């Protein structure tokens, strides 16, 4: 079973307030987002997280689309640093796909000007 968690207390400060998907059957944790020390989608054994306290995050899984139609939502979870590194080292990110005006595109296929524009429009200093 997969459980979503937010780590609220940990010996490793990089884990504080990070979000993970725990797979109890495999004994693995997949990083959704962390301040540092762990990459997005990195899978680690649960015991590598050390002594932690967490709160469960409700997850809704719908096995099928309703009869009246479905909704589609694409959410990109990225850090500014990831896109900036992709600009400098595109060979490290051949599969990096982002949403631009409702379309999915490979970040590396954009011109440098478009890449800068995406970074500027996507990330703000505050809400």
From Swiss-Prot:
Sites bearing Glycine radical, chain numbering? 102
Q: Keywords for this entry?
A: Organic radical
Q: Indicate yes or no for the key word Aminoacyl-tRNA synthetase.
A: no
Q: Which residues cross the membrane?
A: none
Glycine radical domain ranges (all copies): 5-127
Cellular component per GO, a single term: cytosol
Q: Name one GO molecular function term.
A: formate C-acetyltransferase activity
Keyword Electron transport carried by entry:
no
PANTHER family, sorted: FORMATE ACETYLTRANSFERASE (PTHR30191), FORMATE ACETYLTRANSFERASE 1 (PTHR30191:SF0)
Function as written in the Swiss-Prot or TrEMBL entry = Acts as a radical domain for damaged PFL and possibly other radical proteins.
**Listed name of the protein:** Autonomous glycyl radical cofactor
Q: Which organism's genome codes for this protein? A: Enterobacter sp. (strain 638)
């Amino acid at each position: 079973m997969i459980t979503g968690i937010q780590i609220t207390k940990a010996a490793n400060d990089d884990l504080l307030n990070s979000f993970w998907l725990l797979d109890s059957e495999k004994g693995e944790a997949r990083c959704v987002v962390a301040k540092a020390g762990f990459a997005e989608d990195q899978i680690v054994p649960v015991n590598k997280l050390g002594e932690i306290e967490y709160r469960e995050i409700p997850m809704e899984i719908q096995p099928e689309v309703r009869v009246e139609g479905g909704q589609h939502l694409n959410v990109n979870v990225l850090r500014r640093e990831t896109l900036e590194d992709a600009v400098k080292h595109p060979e490290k990110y051949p599969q990096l796909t982002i949403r631009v005006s409702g379309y999915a595109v490979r970040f590396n296929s954009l011109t440098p000007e478009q890449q800068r524009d995406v970074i500027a429009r996507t990330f703000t200093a505050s809400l």
